């Protein structure tokens, strides 16, 4: 299923086949599979959920990433690393640890480390003690790791080879879950609403959403043959033959199928929009002091502002940091670090704690809320040659971050009116309590059809009972996506109508269940998203009620006439607020099998 061309005994194309198809032959990969490796512990030791985290938390007994260490210990105990040739596992420097611009060199970490655990995954109804399939980073810190690239993780015995990034899936997992998690390993986010408060419009249109659970129409299972990635994911990875335009350009061209490079036709079109600005007010100023250093906010951050001293401190020196912070308590942390020799030490302060309820405090971390500006005191150790302000967040939720107004010790008084002495490392200077950012956004149009692996678009499913699904075809045609860099996730529950990458539904009005009482899920609200020349229909069954046929009349024109042209307040989580750019895309013609559409882009 993983690397064998044709999938071997799996019967469907392998993961290697799938990614070669996704990339239109631009990406090829191979790997090694170890023998089954016993590890110490039960599935509950690694997969049980805390009450606070709920389903998929896998954190009741500590971070689930401890399974990485247990697996590495098991590989060492096997005597031959489970049959893995470790000379072949480190070829790239994926984060450019030595900052030389060369990613094609070893960095001491296994390039891609995946684990398959026995039994079912929690994500496939394996029970609350099972591990939820995911991609993450094990034991992140900057004190452990190979020489020259200390990014945490765990070492494989004493080989000098470490594991940081990893994925884990269940032994009965379908290829879709493996493909989805590998997508994360390549840098792609989840497209579904990870708050689980709503369903956005991505549905089965992307591997990084429900598309990971796709299968062929005739397949009695789900998740065995995922849908393709969306146009933005392929653009991000450089896997598209792309037509690029700017808003206001007028052009007529042909779009071939997004699922393959047809050479003579484009796979997708990108329409770049004028940038826009937004003013943020993260923290108020501290009295008359107008300037502060700000960490920023977001998921999976590790920002480090470094101030190198002109010499080293001769003795332990009291330090006072003026700060205001709002940090997700127990999960995200800020640190005051001191560099002594070549080692960074986490300084204990009046606001820090050594407690680590979720095993994410690297030591002396600051978390929670300060309720305004306060003085944080501590001691920089003798021999300090630099200090560092660090803000680290995990992959979900989060607060506003932390603001630093002043750092005082000895004769040094670093007010933030001048930050030129800092290597900011992602932090920014804020004046007057606000700053303005500029964001890029654009539309992507792709021709989607149930062909090649994407024939799983005719295996889109919905449950009619707890263990029975019916399958239907998503509509064919031109799917228009709105990519907005000013929105950091697709959690429309928190920002209705807005996401980082969402498909615009050509039929944005609500679809109601046969009894007239409920909305169909977001997956089915978006079934008719494409702009098309054709009338298309599906028949959906509501358990205990009956079936109803829903018809989508042809809609040939996408016209971004206003930000709410395709947004419905009574479908706020599933419809999309667009840019209001006046851009227009018209479907003019198509060949008989709809493998090629002629489209025109202009501005009305």
Regions found by a protein language model. Give the residues of each.
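Active-site-proximal segment of zinc-dependent metalloprotease catalytic domains
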Residues: 1-201, 205, 209-214
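Non-catalytic C-terminal accessory/binding modules of secreted extracellular proteins
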Residues: 2-37, 45, 61-64, 125-169, ...
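Short beta-strands within extracellular/lumenal beta-sheet-rich domains
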Residues: 269-271, 295-314, 371-378
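Extended extracellular/luminal ectodomain segments enriched in beta-structured repeat modules
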Residues: 300-304, 311-322, 329-331, 383-386, ...
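Beta-strand acidic-aromatic groove motif in beta-rich domains, primarily in extracellular
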Residues: 329-336, 398-402
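Short beta-strand segments and strand-loop junctions that repeat across beta-rich extracellular domains
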Residues: 333-347, 388, 418-423
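Short beta-strand-plus-loop segments that form exposed binding edges in beta-rich domains
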Residues: 389-397
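Exposed low-complexity, polar/acidic, P/S/T/G-rich flexible segments that act as propeptides
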Residues: 397-424, 428, 432-435
């Amino acid at each position: 299923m993983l690397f064998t061309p044709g999938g071997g005994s799996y019967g469907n194309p392998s993961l290697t086949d799938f990614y070669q198809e996704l990339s239109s032959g631009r990406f090829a990969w191979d790997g090694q599979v170890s023998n089954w490796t016993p590890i110490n512990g039960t599935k509950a030791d690694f997969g049980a959920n805390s009450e606070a985290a709920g389903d998929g938390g896998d954190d009741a007994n500590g971070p689930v990433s401890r399974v990485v260490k247990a697996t590495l210990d098991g590989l060492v105990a096997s005597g031959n690393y489970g049959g893995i040739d470790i000379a072949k596992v480190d070829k790239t420097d994926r984060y450019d640890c030595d900052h030389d611009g060369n990613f094609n060199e070893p960095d001491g970490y296994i390039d891609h480390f995946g684990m398959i655990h026995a039994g079912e995954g929690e994500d496939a109804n394996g029970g609350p003690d099972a591990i939820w399939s995911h991609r993450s980073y094990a034991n992140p810190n900057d004190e452990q790791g190979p020489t020259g690239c200390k990014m945490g993780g765990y070492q494989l015995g004493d080989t000098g080879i470490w594991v940081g990034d990893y994925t884990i899936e269940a032994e009965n997992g379908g290829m879709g879950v493996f493909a989805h998690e590998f997508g994360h390993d390549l840098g792609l986010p989840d497209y579904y609403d990870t708050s689980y408060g709503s369903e956005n419009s991505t549905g089965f249109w992307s591997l990084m959403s429900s598309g990971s659970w796709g299968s062929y129409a005739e397949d009695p299972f789900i998740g065995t043959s995922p849908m393709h990635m969306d146009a933005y994911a392929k653009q991000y990875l450089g896997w598209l033959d792309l037509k690029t335009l700017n808003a206001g350009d007028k052009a007529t061209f042909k779009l071939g199928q997004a699922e393959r490079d047809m050479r003579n036709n484009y796979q997708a079109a990108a329409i770049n929009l004028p940038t826009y600005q937004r003013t943020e007010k993260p923290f108020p100023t501290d009295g008359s002091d107008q300037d502060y250093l700000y960490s920023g906010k977001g998921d999976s951050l590790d920002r480090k502002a470094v101030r190198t001293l002109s010499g080293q401190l001769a003795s332990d020196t009291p330090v006072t940091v003026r700060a205001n912070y709002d940090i997700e308590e127990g999960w995200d942390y800020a640190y005051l670090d001191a560099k002594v020799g070549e080692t960074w030490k986490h300084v204990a302060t009046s606001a820090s704690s050594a407690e680590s309820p979720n095993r994410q405090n690297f030591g002396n971390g600051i978390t929670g809320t300060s309720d305004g500006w306060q003085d944080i005191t501590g001691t920089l150790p003798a021999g300090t040659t630099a200090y560092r302000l660090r803000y680290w967040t995990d992959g979900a939720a989060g607060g506003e971050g932390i603001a630093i107004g002043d750092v005082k010790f000895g004769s040094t008084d670093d007010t933030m009116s001048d930050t030129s002495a800092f290597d900011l490392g992602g932090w920014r200077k804020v004046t007057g309590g606000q700053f303005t950012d500029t964001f890029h956004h654009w539309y992507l149009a792709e021709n989607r059809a149930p062909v090649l692996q994407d024939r799983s678009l005719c295996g889109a499913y919905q449950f009619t009972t707890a263990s029975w699904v019916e399958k239907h075809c998503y509509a064919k045609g031109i799917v228009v996506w709105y990519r907005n860099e000013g929105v950091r996730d697709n959690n429309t529950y928190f920002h209705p109508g807005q996401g980082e990458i969402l498909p615009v539904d050509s039929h944005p009005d609500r679809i109601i269940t046969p009894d007239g009482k409920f909305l169909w899920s977001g997956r089915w609200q978006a079934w008719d998203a494409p702009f098309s020349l054709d009338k298309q229909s599906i028949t959906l069954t509501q358990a205990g009620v009956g079936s109803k046929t829903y018809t989508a009349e042809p809609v040939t024109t996408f016209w971004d006439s206003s930000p709410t042209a395709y947004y419905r307040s009574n479908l706020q989580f599933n419809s999309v607020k667009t840019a209001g750019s006046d851009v227009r895309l018209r479907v003019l013609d198509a060949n008989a099998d709809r493998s090629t559409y002629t489209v025109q882009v202009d501005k009305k």
